[in-house]
Amino acid sequence: MTITAHMTPDTLDATFFALSSDLRRRVLDLLKREPGCNVNRVAEVFASEVGRFAIMKHLAVLELGGLVVSQREGRERRLWFDATPIQLIHERWTTEFSV
């Protein structure tokens, strides 16, 4: 199955945009190490660099790119890294464009 079956050009662009920021990539690293952590934990880890509002904006970009899945539990929002878009991109460039 090709990437076009799973991702539109807009979602592909959103994924690449989400990955274009070093901070967002480090947020993904955190979510990989600590799956299901809450927004407060992410804000705490990066507090010396950016404020909570900026973290919320970065998380929104990651969600639009399909790289973060969130689930509300009461007043908390739990977060997980979803590598599916990266796997689909990898599939495209290793299968569709291979010699």
Predicted regions mapped to residue ranges:
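Short beta-strand "wing" residues that participate in macromolecule-binding interfaces
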Residues: S70
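Short, hydrophobic-biased segments on the C-terminal half of alpha helices
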Residues: L59-A60
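Glycine-centered, phosphate/nucleic-acid-interacting loop/turn motifs that mediate DNA/RNA or nucleotide
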Residues: G66
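A general boundary/transition motif marking the beginning of the first structured unit of a protein
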Residues: M7, T15, R92-E96
